Each structure stands twice: as structure tokens, then as C-alpha cells.
Regions:
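Conserved acidic segment of CheY-like receiver
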Residues: 1-9
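Conserved phosphotransfer microenvironments
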Residues: 49-65
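A short, hydrophobic beta-strand element within the central beta-sheet of small alpha/beta folds
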Residues: 73-83
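Conserved phosphotransfer cores of two-component systems
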Residues: 42, 66-72
């Protein structure tokens, strides 16, 4: 299972199409608060985070993820446009397992999701 925090419908649609092909359930939410609720309830294998999601506090999300027990802590991948260097750095500093540019995410999303199935 995957939780995807994004308000970008194109990214969500692309990820959903790949997840469907792989037979993986994906839940898209538009806030970190809702994302954390779903993570705690459903214990996904992967959390995808659009670091450019409006209102997202990257540091607070990282702190919330760090508090999770290892048994429910998902692999966390954040992404943002390559010019958003502060957001990319914030994702790294927040302890995300991987931080990608939006272009990398677009080209690798199928492989990333296949790794969950």
C-alpha cells in the first residue's frame, strides 16, 4: 500500500495508473495531517510526498515520521521541482529516505511502485 501526499492531480493520476498496473493500493491525500492519519491506520509500505504541496510543513512531517515505531514507518520519498532547492534540502534534512526532483519522480514512479508490489 502507498500513501501519496499531493495536491497535483496529474502526479496523482500518473502514480495511480502505475499502482493499478502493479495491483498496489494507493491513497492520495492533500495534507500531511491526513497523510499521517492514513499512515498510522493503514501502515503503508511507501509514503510519497510532494514537497511543494501547499501548506506542507516538511520539518514537522519529518518529525512526525521519526516518532513512528519502526514497524509502521514507511519508506518515505519526497520530490519537488529541481529549482526548489530549499524544499529538496528540507526533505533531506527532515530525514526522508530519498528526495528526488519532479522529473526524476515522473520517470521513476513506475519502478518505485513496482518495488512495493
Amino acid at each position: 500500500m502507498i500513501v501519496f501526499i499531493t495536491s497535483d492531480l496529474m502526479m496523482a493520476s500518473n502514480a495511480s495508473a502505475h499502482a493499478k498496473q502493479q495491483g498496489v493500493k494507493i491513497t492520495q491525500v492533500s495534507s500531511a495531517e491526513r497523510g499521517m492519519e492514513v499512515v498510522k491506520e493503514d501502515r503503508p509500505h511507501l509514503l510519497l510526498v510532494d514537497l511543494q504541496c501547499p501548506g506542507l510543513d516538511i520539518e514537522a512531517l519529518g518529525a512526525s515520521l521519526a516518532k513512528l515505531a519502526d514497524s509502521i514507518s514507511p519508506l518515505t520519498i519526497g520530490f519537488a521541482q529541481h529549482v526548489e532547492t530549499e524544499k529538496l534540502s528540507a526533505g533531506r534534512n527532515a530525514g526522508f529516505d530519498q528526495v528526488l526532483t519532479r522529473g526524476q519522480m515522473n520517470s521513476q514512479v513506475g519502478q518505485i511502485i513496482a518495488g512495493v508490489s
